[in-house]
Amino acid sequence: MPARLPRRALLRTAPLTLLLAGCGFELRKPPSFAFQSIYLAVPPMSPLGLELQRALAASGSVSLVTDPRQVERADLVFELLQELREKVVLGRTSTGAVREYQLRVRLRFKVRNRQGIERIPDTEMVQQRDISYSESSALAKEAEEDLLYRNMQSDLVRQILRRLAALREI
């Protein structure tokens, strides 16, 4: 009897495995870019700019032009126009104390090629997360807030990379 149990389990899972393989499902691959070099016009200490630099360098197929005097060597120029973190009160208790916040990261950018032609026009991207607040756990909530901001920033960087990968003509 124990030898039949694994065989039954195998017979039950085999059709699901074949169905999943046949539907065309595959894991997301690293992006492939149509350009070889890019200049990032971002503020020097911008956390989003630093993460974007790391992500592009990790791709291995793109070289970063870091010297502003060498901008004309870059195939594309990424301009970060605005990076804004917001914290908005969502709810209050009956005594007027804050109960819930909404955290937002607002980002505006555009991408142009070496000739100055815009390849991605002025684009605004917004990420938002809700967070509850309690005076008794203020330090923990501050750490949670930092974590949420980092997660939103990472998500925005992934979205930017997907948009850059979608460019087929530079």
Which residue ranges define each predicted feature?
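Sec/Tat-exported extracytoplasmic proteins
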Residues: 56, 60, 84, 111, ...
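Surface-exposed short loop/turn segments
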Residues: 77-124, 130-143
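Bacterial lipoprotein signal-peptidase II cleavage site
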Residues: 25-30
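C-terminal/domain-edge helix-coil "capping" segments
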Residues: 139-170
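C-terminal motif of bacterial Sec signal peptides marking the signal peptidase cleavage site
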Residues: 21-22
